[in-house]
Amino acid sequence: MQKLGKQTIKFDTPPVITEVASIVGPKEANGPLAKYFDQCLEDEFWGEKTWEKSESKIIKETVNMAISKSGVSSNDIEYCFAGDLLNQCISSSFGLRELNIPFIGIFGACSTFVEGLSLGAIITEACAKHVLCAASSHFCSAEKQFRFPLELGNQRPPSSQWTVTGSGAAVLSKSGEGPFITHITSGKIVDMGIKDANNMGAAMAPAALDTLICHFKDTGRAPSYYDAIITGDLGYIGKEILTELAQDKGYNIKSNYNDCGVMIFDKELQDTHSGGSGCGCCATVFSGYFFKQFKDKKIKRLLLIATGALTNATTSQQGESIPGIAHAISIEM
C-alpha cells in the first residue's frame, strides 16, 4: 500500500469484498430497497425481550449469514471489526461474543461500517487472508439512548431522521473476483458549530465535503470518474447541503450523487421526515443494494462515504456542538 496526499491510501493488492449480508427491520422491509436485503424482520423484537437484545441478535445473524455465503470457514477469518451506536458497543460485543474470532470493536457513529471496511482493508493487505466487518443500529434502542423513550410519544421535527433497524456485514479477502477496495480516505473531525441534535444532516455534511474534496485532490480524480458517489446518512437536508457546498468548491456531483438515508425509505409513503440514519443505514444499503449492482455489472466504480455525528445525549444536553466525521472508500470492479 502507498500513501497518497494527506489522507488517502492506495492498495497495491486491493482487498476483495468476497461476500456480504444484510438483515433489516419491518419499516425498512416496507421501503423501496426491500427486495435487495437478505432477510426482513416482521417486528423490532425478533423474539427477544429487549431492543438491545434484538439488535445483538440482528448483527449476530447477519455476520453468520455473511460467513456462510462467503464459503470461508469462520476458523479462517483472522479479525473482526464491528461497531454500533449503543454505549460501549454492546450490540456488537454481546452479539459476537461466541464468534471466536479476534474482535476489534470500533466506534465512528454512523460512519462505523466504512471505518471498519477501511481498517479491514489495511489489515487484509498487510497480513490477513480473511477479515470480517460489520455494523448495526436499531431505531428503538437508539431513540431510547439518544433522544426520548418511545413511550413518551415525543413529536419529531421535520429535520430529524429515522434510525435504521438493521445490520450489514462483509467478508474481505486477499484474492477473488471483486469488487475491490482500491483506495480509502480517512476523514478528519469537522465541527461547524451545529448544535441541533434533530438536524444531524447539517452537522455531518461539512465533514462529508472535507473528505470528498480530500479524496479528489489526493487521487487526482474528478466526480465523473465514479458511476455513483454515495454518502451514508445525510438524509434529504444533508444531501442538499453537501451538493451545494461541493458546487461552491467547484465539484459538480448532482448527476451521480445519492445518499443511503434518502434511498432506504419512501419519502411519500413512510413518515421518516429527513430520511434514514444510523450505522445500519450505510451498512444495509451497501450490503443489500450496491453489492448486487456490482455483481450484476450495473456499476463499476463507487465512492462510498459514510458519515457520523460524534455526539451523545450528555453533550447535547450540555449545549455542545456536534462534531462530524466522514470516511470514504473507493470500490471498483
Identify the role of each PLM range.
Residues 93-96, 234-249, 314-321:
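Short glycine/threonine-rich loop-to-helix capping motif typified by GTGT followed
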Residues 106-134, 172, 277-298:
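Active-site-proximal alpha-helical scaffold in enzymes
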Residues 17, 51-110, 225-240:
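Conserved beta-ketoacyl condensing-enzyme motif
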Residues 55-71, 119, 203-218, 285-290:
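Short, well-ordered amphipathic alpha-helical segments that serve as non-catalytic structural scaffolds
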Residues 1-50, 149-214, 218-221, 252-271, ...:
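Condensing-enzyme catalytic core mediating Claisen C-C bond formation in acyl metabolism
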Residues 282-283, 289-320:
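Internal helix-turn-beta structural module
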Residues 83-88, 110-111, 135-144, 187-189, ...:
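Acidic, glycine-rich active-site loops and adjacent beta-strand->loop/helix elements
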Residues 95-102, 121, 141-159, 316-319:
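Cofactor- and metal-binding active-site motifs of prokaryotic enzymes
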